[in-house]
């Protein structure tokens, strides 16, 4: 074979090897998620999406409800307006819930902005939070992701980003016994309240948490829906005042406070520092590691001490009016830490209660009777979290 022919064969073989190597390298880039130059031109800065605490599913009389928060931080140099948020099944992208328009506005909060603000725009370098609740039906996803559509000013136009994968937490622990006797009690809570427990972050110890994510405030009423039998400004005239507060399970006492004074009048209750908001309280450590909190207890009524072992139904103290309170009630919540301000709120179920009805309008608390439960619907509820502003009765 002539020398020229040998050189031509080697050259052709080198070209083939370069072509194969180029294709192989391109495959590696694609597999690694590294954009080729043409794709890089379409990339754009937008939101950093985060779910800081796992989405939690909890059973109510309306079925399985999921509670979560989506944090959106704007890393661009221009304001981004959130126009739509979707929760999707991470396995196949099936849309599980979607929020837009006024519904999205009601769920959105810009950190540091006035509570009444309705705009869903996140300025550069700021963080917004979308408080999300959605109903499960037949599908029980193992994990979810989020798709956020947004509008940017000028030529940037509209875009969307998908991310914030999170594993759904289905465990709610062993159902608990009643924290109070009898009733009727209004189970006061509502996810949509902009300054309600469900939306209040406490940022201590370097972390932002929502201790009251699933908190319930229990207010005693009579058959006519009244909260008092005399002077509404006198704490002692409220129906629930002094009611025995009960251990919801066999547990160990983790923390107590019993020395805070109580305002002589409802209207005269002063503002309190964050560490004093709970008033007098008892925290018990459940055997599954969760902590149950009983807050705003009557001064001098706490009947247990730290380290003491208590049993379900045992009296821990009395309902009172200490701390940040607008009237005598029992604040009850469950969290993952023995601190009133530095724990993440966790879902809980009561093993049994009677559902008498509900208040559609919280403005009617103390003014009128609740809307009674439909006679055809089951009154006895088991292994459930009380629905928003439900009126319940526990066993005597």
Question: Where does each model-flagged region fall?
Answer:
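Asparagine-centered strand-capping/turn motif at beta-strand->loop junctions
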Residues: 72-79
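Acidic, glycine-rich catalytic/binding loops that coordinate metals and/or anionic ligands
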Residues: 170-189, 196-200, 206, 229, ...
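Zn2+-dependent peptidoglycan hydrolase active-site motif and core
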Residues: 250-298
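A structural signal for short beta-strand/turn segments enriched in small hydrophobics and glycine
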Residues: 251-253, 307-319
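Short, solvent-exposed loop/turn segments enriched in Ser/Thr/Gly
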Residues: 52-53, 62-69
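Intrinsically disordered, low-complexity Pro/Gly/Ser/Thr-rich segments with frequent PxxP/GP/PP motifs
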Residues: 97-139
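Short glycine/threonine/proline-enriched tight-turn/helix- or strand-capping micro-motif at secondary-structure
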Residues: 197-247, 256-275, 396
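Short histidine-centered loop motifs in beta-beta connectors
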Residues: 290-313
């Amino acid at each position: 074979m002539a020398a020229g022919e040998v050189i031509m064969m080697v050259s052709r073989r080198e070209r083939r090897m370069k072509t194969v190597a180029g294709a192989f390298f391109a495959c590696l880039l694609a597999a690694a998620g590294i954009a080729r130059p043409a794709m890089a031109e379409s990339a754009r800065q937008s939101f950093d999406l985060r779910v800081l605490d796992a989405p939690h599913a909890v059973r109510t009389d309306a079925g399985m409800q999921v509670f979560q928060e989506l944090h959106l931080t704007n890393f661009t140099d221009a304001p981004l307006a959130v126009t739509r948020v979707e929760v999707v099944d991470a396995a196949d992208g099936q849309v599980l819930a979607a929020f837009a328009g006024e519904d999205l506005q009601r769920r959105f909060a810009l950190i540091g902005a006035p509570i009444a603000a309705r705009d869903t725009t996140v300025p550069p370098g700021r963080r917004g939070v979308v408080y999300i609740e959605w109903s499960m039906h037949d599908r029980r996803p193992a994990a979810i992701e989020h798709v956020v559509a947004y509008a940017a000013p000028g030529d940037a136009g509209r875009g969307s980003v998908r991310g914030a994968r999170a594993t759904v937490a289905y465990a709610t622990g062993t159902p608990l016994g009643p924290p109070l006797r009898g009733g009727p009690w209004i189970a006061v809570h509502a996810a949509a309240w902009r300054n309600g427990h469900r939306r209040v972050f406490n940022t201590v110890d370097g972390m932002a948490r929502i201790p009251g994510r699933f908190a319930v405030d229990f207010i005693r009423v009579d058959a006519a829906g009244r909260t008092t039998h005399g002077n509404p400004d006198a704490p002692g005239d409220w129906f629930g005042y002094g009611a025995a507060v009960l251990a919801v399970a066999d547990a160990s006492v983790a923390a107590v406070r019993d020395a805070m004074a109580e305002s002589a009048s409802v209207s005269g209750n002063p503002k309190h520092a964050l560490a004093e908001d709970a008033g007098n309280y008892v925290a018990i450590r459940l055997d599954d590691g969760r902590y149950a909190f009983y807050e705003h207890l009557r001064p001098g009524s706490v009947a247990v001490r730290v380290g003491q072992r208590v049993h379900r139904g045992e009296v821990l103290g009395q309902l009172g009016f200490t701390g940040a309170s607008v009237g005598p009630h029992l604040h009850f919540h469950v969290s993952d830490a023995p601190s009133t301000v530095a724990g993440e709120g966790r879902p809980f179920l009561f093993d049994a209660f009677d559902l008498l009805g509900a208040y559609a309008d919280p403005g009617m608390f103390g003014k009128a009777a609740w809307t009674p439960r439909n006679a055809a619907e089951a009154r006895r509820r088991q292994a459930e979290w009380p629905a928003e502003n439900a009126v319940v009765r526990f066993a005597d």
